[in-house]
A protein has these predicted regions:
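Active-site entrance/lid segments in N-terminal catalytic domains of soluble metabolic enzymes
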Residues: 1-137
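Short His-Asn-centered micro-motif
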Residues: 52, 145-146
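Conserved active-site-proximal phosphate/metal-binding subdomains
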Residues: 105-143, 149-310
Length: 310
């Protein structure tokens, strides 16, 4: 499943686009062979390792021979950051940045499905909480993510303590995004009620666009076979059979534009993407009305400009 050759090829293609600028690899902590994939990413030329879907407590050890590689955890609470910082400090490292992801993001969430809409888990409440914890350990940047749509959202979240922002769903709706045309069409045509929460074999709730896959899910589907053994919580397909789909197969199908069998992740605001635009136009839309200090922050190297997901 986790091919070094594939990782190297992905990075070669990414380098053609970003040149010598920082290139990050986003690696789920929940995958099997997590340590090997971190190793592969570094060998392939990653400047930054980003990790969510769990607490990557062992990450400093995995990069100890590569002090120039930045390590960036994704958290959904100040408590999670405290645990990470305490463990990493003992290993001689601290985060080079932290991504604070709220429950309006696309894909896997950091809290239980029944807790997603509680006030205490909303981005505007967890950013100050994470900042308070961050200040105890240093001044590494806080990158806010999850449901950020426009310049007003950027200003508000930075006033609450974020140093930068991360957007994903809006960039799917750009000409330059390498998502399939089918994926883009599904996003552009999605209505508000089409953005739904699904149970994932990863063990976390996920936010996706409702397609035929979601409509026809059958729990306890014993016909599902495990071919990749990709994530530990799934336990060789046991989790996939419980929820009714294989995460590896269905995400692969979405990448390849298979409308009926693909799992198309989207943030809560995905339905607001109603046409494709260029990345340049999107960036201009996001930063033009912002205050000067916010524009400067968005432009700094603290932003992870290019990310490979693995």
């Amino acid at each position: 499943m986790n091919s070094k050759e594939a990782m190297i090829e992905i990075f070669k293609n990414a380098r053609k686009i970003c040149g010598n600028k920082p290139l990050a690899c986003n690696i789920l902590h929940a995958i099997n062979d997590y340590s090997k994939v971190v190793e592969y990413a570094i060998e392939a030329g990653a400047n930054i390792i980003v990790t969510g879907a769990g607490l990557p407590l062992e990450l400093p050890k995995l990069v100890e021979n590569h002090p120039d590689v930045a390590i960036v955890p994704i958290v959904s609470s100040g408590r999670a950051l405290k645990i990470i910082c305490k463990k990493w400090k003992a290993a001689g490292r601290l985060p080079d940045a932290v991504i604070v992801e709220g429950p309006k993001s696309g894909g896997h969430q950091g809290v239980k499905a029944e807790d997603l809409f509680l006030p205490e888990h909303q981005l505007e409440n967890i950013v100050p909480e994470v900042k308070e914890e961050r200040d105890k350990w240093g001044d590494f940047p806080i990158i806010a993510a999850g449901g950020i749509w426009d310049n007003d959202d950027i200003q508000k979240i930075m006033e609450l303590g974020a140093d930068a922002v991360q957007l994903g769903t809006r960039f799917i709706g750009t000409y330059e995004c390498d998502a399939s045309e089918e994926f883009k069409n599904i996003l552009v045509n999605a209505e508000k009620e089409d953005i739904v929460i699904v149970k994932s074999p990863v063990g976390y709730p996920g936010r996706s666009i409702k397609t035929n896959l979601i409509k026809n899910l059958k729990a306890d589907n014993q016909a599902i076979k495990c071919y990749s053994n990709c994530i530990a919580p799934c336990n060789l397909g046991e989790g996939a059979r419980k929820v009714g789909f294989c995460i590896a197969n269905c995400l692969g199908d979405s990448y390849n534009g298979k409308v009926d069998t693909g799992l198309f992740f989207s943030g809560e605001n995905g339905y607001r993407v109603n046409k494709l635009i260029s990345v340049e136009d999107l960036i201009n839309e996001l930063i033009t009305p912002c205050r000067k200090d916010i524009i400067v922050n968005i432009s700094t190297e603290n932003i992870i400009e290019n990310t490979v997901n693995f």
